[in-house]
Each structure stands twice: as C-alpha cells, then as structure tokens.
UniProtKB/Swiss-Prot annotation:
GO terms for molecular function: phosphatidylinositol-4,5-bisphosphate binding. Its main location: cytoplasm. The lineage of its organism: Eukaryota, Viridiplantae, Streptophyta, Embryophyta, Tracheophyta. It comes from Arabidopsis thaliana. This is Exocyst complex component EXO70H1. The keyword Lipid metabolism does not apply.
Length: 636
C-alpha cells in the first residue's frame, strides 16, 4: 500500500513513472487578478477532493474500509478518479505558484490516501475478477485496445456519454464480454491515474504479482512443468511421446489464448505507457514462455532414430503453426528471448529430423536379411519402408523446409529425370522433398534387386521384383506421394513392372509355350503324340512349380493369369482340335491327352495364391480314369 508519509509531489515513489509536466495542463493567466482567482479555484478543488477522498480512506474504521469503491458505485468511482485528476492539477499549480500554501500539504496527504485506495481497488479488482479476466475472455476481444467503446470510460467527464458508450458496446457483445470489458476499463482507469500521479511502480508491482501467478497456474493446469535436461535423459520414449502430444495441445492453448490474452490485457491496462506494458508483460510471461519452448529443444537432443521422427515433426509443425502468434506476442526487445528460444528449438528439431532421415536411409542400405520371401511375395523391408515413406509424405511442409537446407550430397540428375519438374511455387518448394523421396525408393529398389539374386529360380526372382514394385507403385499412387513424385514417375515404374512380369512369364512358362509346334499343320500321329506328351509334361512341371508362387495384388495376379492364358490356351486349343481326332483309336487316351483346353484356363486361374501342388493323383500317369474325369480331362 502507498505510504502515508509526507512527500514532495515531484519526488515520486516510482522514479520510473513521472507525473506529467505542468505545461501539459491548462495554462493559467499571469495577471494578479486572474492568478488570485485561479488559486482560489485550485484551493476549492483541494477542499472538494478532501470530502470525496477521505470518505474512501482505507485506513478509517468505516464501511468503506471493507467495501470496494468500484463495486459499490461506479458513479462514485468515476467521481473519485476525476477528483484525483483535478487534485493532481491543483498540486501542480500550487507547487508552481505558492509552494508554502497549507492547501498543498493537505493535497499531498489526500493524494497519499487516494493512492492507497486505488492501490487497494486495483488489487481487489485483479484478484476477484479472475473469471472475467481469464485469457480466453480477453483474447476474444482482440481489438479491445483500439475499440472506442472501451476507451476512457472511467475518465469521461460526461457520465451520460460514458453510459451511452457502454450501452452501445452491449448491443454488439455478449454479457460475459461486457463484464470483462468493464473490469478492464476499471483497471485501465486506475492504472492511468496512479501512473500519472507518480505511483506507477506500486501499480505495476501488484499487477505483475497477480497476473504472473495466473499465467503460471494456467500452464501448470495444461501439464507444463519446469523443464530440465536431466529429466529427459531418464524418461523412456513411450512416456516422452505422451509428453510431446500433451505439449503440442498445451502450447496451442498457451500461445493462442493464455499469452495472447495476457498481452492484450497488459496492452489495454497500460496503454498510456509503452515501457510500462512491455516491462509488465516481460515480468509476467518471459520466464514461463521461455520454459515452454525449452521442451522441444530437450526432446531434439535425445537419441536420434528414424522411429522417433514423427513426434519430432509434430513438434516442428506445431511451432511453425504458432509462429505468427509468437512473433505478434513477443515482438519487442524485452521478450525477444522467448522468440530466440523458439527459434533454437526449431533449429534443433530440424537437425534431429534430418539425422533421423539419414538414419532411415542407412537402415535400408544396411539391411542384411537373407531369408527369402516364400513364393516371391512382398518383403517386409518393402512394406516397412513404403509405410514409413508414405507417412513422411504427410509432413511435406515440415520436410520441405528441412531438405531445402540439406540437399542430397550426390548427383541427382537421374533422380530429377524421374520427378516432374515444378510448375508452381508450391511444387518448387517441395521439389527437394520429391527428389529425396525418389532417392529413398531407388535405394529400396536397389536393395530388392540384391535380394532377388538370392533366389535360385530366375522366374521367382522376377516375380519377387514384380510383387515388390507393385506395392511401391500402389503406395505412391494412393498417398500424397503421387503429387510429390508425379505421373511421370508412376508411368516409368509401371513400365518397369510390366517388364518384370514379362520376364517372369518367359522364365516360368517358356518351356510350355515352346512345347507345341510353331506351325501345327501336317503332323503324323506319332509326331502328334510326342507333342501332346511334351506339352503335358512341360505344363505339369510348370504348374506344380508355379502353384507355390504368390501374387498378393489382385490386379497384378489377374493380369498375369490373363497374359499366360492368352499365350497358351488358344495355341493348345488349335492343336487339340486338329490332332485329337487323329488319335481317337489310341488305347489309354486319357493318359496321352490329359487336358482339355477349357481346363487349362481353370488350372491357370488357380495360380498365384501360394498353394503348392505336389506330384499327386492330379498329375500322375498312373491315376485312375475317374480322377482325370473329375479334372475335366479327356475320357477313354
């Protein structure tokens, strides 16, 4: 509370805040007559202030000691503020014209009483109206500092005009906002009165103490703690992931609502003094906000692994999304450290994210798994790599910024030829990312080529490559990777897939294709029997071997079946139609001619499900006639 000791008006208890100079007030006439008249007016002002101010002396044993002036009567509160303003003007006059006047000593005493009352009112309003001054309510009134409805309500000389302004404001805002605006106006009026009278230090001290506790409490309720590096070294990654998710939610509320609301409130209450509001906001927010942005830096310093990249990118994206608010709220020099800490965290995160990308590439290159995928199916490295890359593609904004600063340290002309040239600013921004993704997939394809060599069967190698390239193409085509890599990339790799599929057909089925005569025109019965036996043997061998092959993708599976059937069935049908009648009198015809053309299609349709068929009654020369009938083969 303001002390009651006698003081010189110009020797403020707060050296930082000086009362306005006499020249800022109304000039007083210099003639003796006018001077005497003015002095009489000033002395009368002091006497008038005496009755108003002493009524609200916080140290007198009356009801006013326990009652809030601003809650009791807004009309009296306005009158009190005006009395303080007039008393200050009178003191300026008396100091300059009659420093020995007994009225000056009285005025000084009254000023001390008034400041004690305003100091008490300021604290009570701040403490008892936390609900009306919560950051969410304040931040909802983003333009309040420039809204005339809320300006100088307490300082208005015209009560009716002030009331009209409040009524006008009430038409466009909710009751909650109206109550909040009224409380803010009261605080502003008190702050301006105390600062103009040299009591800014006392006013600011109260404000800082109350509002800092609110900010600290708000962050604590959001789950923000005092962060220290040692805490992170002892925390497992699962717990840290949970902390990251909580921090992102808390930071969004903390910046967009808590700190923004505090900045708006501080700017409004201390709008008369830039230095005061900056100093206030620094004391209230700097420590808490700096601590808030230390969290991402500590996380970024932990062990770097590609598995941890996504939470790191979530942190990076969260800070980037908040950056406009950060710059707006912490724009002046006193709180520049907050922005500096946020920038440091961003840079540390970028380094960690890039390191995780490098780690991911290294894991692909160093994969030494030698176990062969049964049936030439999809390798787990392909699935895990493409799942990871497709997830990365959802963070194109974050990764584009990072990779723009870390271009691939190799000749990328070949890669860039696979990626569509950027035609817009956004595509230009993402071009480095597109090239990087193309590179990662190329690293995977090279590794798959190496793994394909481990198969002893060439046809199985090609089927393995086709299956794995198919899932790569499918993943690219159904995720944001498509926009990043472009249709040219897809077309080139689809052509490559067709080549793998074609090579598989040649390696797996060429013996069957070549088992029939190229020109089945004039064959003797003996020659026809040889070709039938050759075809059946080749088909049985190929079918039994290929029955264990697997093609998970339905589209590729059907395309392979159709392609094989088109090459095989028509030729066999023609051969069968022409030479079967020639062998009609042969004994054991069901053994010699074992397949009808229609049933070849049935056999082919059963392929690529990974169900192996071993030498059995189905393909045994000693099978009974009924067995072959059940398969749709020629009967005797």
């Amino acid at each position: 509370m303001a002390k009651m000791a006698k003081f010189s008006f110009f020797s403020s208890s707060s050296p930082k805040y000086h009362p306005s100079s006499p020249s800022s007030f109304t000039s007083f006439p210099a003639s003796p007559l006018n001077q005497n008249f003015t002095q009489a007016m000033m002395e009368e002002t002091v006497e008038t202030a005496d009755s108003v101010i002493r009524k609200w002396d916080p140290n007198t044993p009356s009801f006013t000691k326990i009652v809030s002036l601003f809650n009791h009567s807004r009309k009296e509160a306005k009158e009190f503020i005006r009395c303080v303003r007039d008393l200050r003007r009178a003191m300026h006059f008396l100091v300059s014209q009659d420093s020995q006047s007994p009225k000056l000593a009285l005025a000084q005493t009254l000023m001390q009483i008034a400041m004690a009352r305003l100091e008490k009112e300021f604290f009570q309003i701040l403490s008892s109206n936390r609900d009306k001054l919560d950051p969410e309510s304040v931040s909802g009134q983003s333009s309040i500092s420039s809204n005339s409805e809320f300006e100088d309500v307490m300082g208005s000389d015209d009560d009716d005009e002030s009331d009209n302004e409040m009524r006008k404001a009430g038409e466009s805002i909710t009751q909650v906002e109206k109550a909040s605006a009224m409380v803010m106006s009261d605080l502003k009026a008190i702050a301006e009165s105390m600062i103009s009278c040299g009591y800014g230090k006392e006013c600011v001290k109260i404000y800082k103490r109350v509002r800092k506790s609110i900010v600290d409490e708000g962050l604590s309720l959001l789950g923000i703690e005092i962060y220290k590096g040692s805490r992170f070294h002892r925390t497992d990654w699962v717990t840290l992931e949970h902390m990251i998710k909580n921090w992102i939610k808390a930071a969004k509320i903390g910046i967009a609502t808590l700190f923004r609301g505090e900045k708006l409130l501080c700017d409004h209450v201390f709008s008369a003094s830039n230095s005061t509001r900056e100093s206030c906001f620094y004391e209230i927010a700097n420590e808490a906000a700096t601590n808030l942005f230390k969290f991402p830096e500590f996380v970024a310093k932990e062990k770097k692994s590609h598995e941890r990249i996504f939470p790191l990118m979530d942190l990076q994206a969260a800070i980037s999304d908040l950056w406009q608010d950060i710059e707006m709220i912490f724009h002046f020099d006193a709180v520049a450290g907050v922005k500096s800490q946020a920038l440091t965290s961003l840079q540390k995160l970028k380094v960690s994210i890039h390191s995780a990308l490098t780690d991911f590439e290294s894991i692909i290159q160093k994969d030494t798994t030698k176990a062969l995928t049964p049936g030439g199916g999809i390798h787990k490295l392909t699935r895990s790599t493409m799942n990871f890359i497709s997830s990365l593609s959802k963070y194109s904004g974050v990764l584009s910024e990072i990779l723009a600063d870390h271009p691939l340290p190799r000749n990328t002309r070949l890669l860039e030829s696979y990626v569509r040239a950027p035609i817009s600013e956004d595509e230009q921004h993402n071009h480095a990312l597109s090239v990087h993704f193309a590179w990662l997939i190329l690293v995977l394809l090279c590794k798959l080529d190496t793994k394909a060599e481990h198969y002893k069967d060439v046809s199985l190698s090609y089927l393995f490559l086709a299956n794995n390239l198919q899932i790569i193409i499918e993943t690219v085509g159904s995720t944001p990777l498509r926009n990043l890599l472009g249709d040219d990339w897809l077309n080139k790799h689809e052509d490559k897939l067709c080549a793998y599929a074609g090579n598989y057909e040649i390696a797996a089925w060429s013996n069957v294709f070549m088992s029939l005569p190229e020109e089945p025109t004039d064959l003797s019965p003996e020659e026809a029997k040889i070709y039938f036996r050759r075809f059946h043997t080749a088909f049985e061998e190929a079918y039994m071997k290929q029955s264990s092959r697997v093609v998970p993708n339905a589209k590729l599976r059907d395309e392979l079946k159709v392609s094989i059937a088109k090459k095989l069935v028509p030729e066999y049908r023609e051969f069968y139609r022409k030479y079967l009648p020639m062998l009609g009198q042969e004994r054991n015809i069901e053994i010699l001619v074992r397949f009808k053309p229609d049933n070849l299609e049935n056999y082919i349709s059963d392929l690529f499900h990974g169900t192996p068929i071993h030498a059995s009654s189905s393909f045994s020369s000693s099978s009974s006639s009924s067995s072959w009938k059940s398969l749709g083969c020629v009967s005797g």
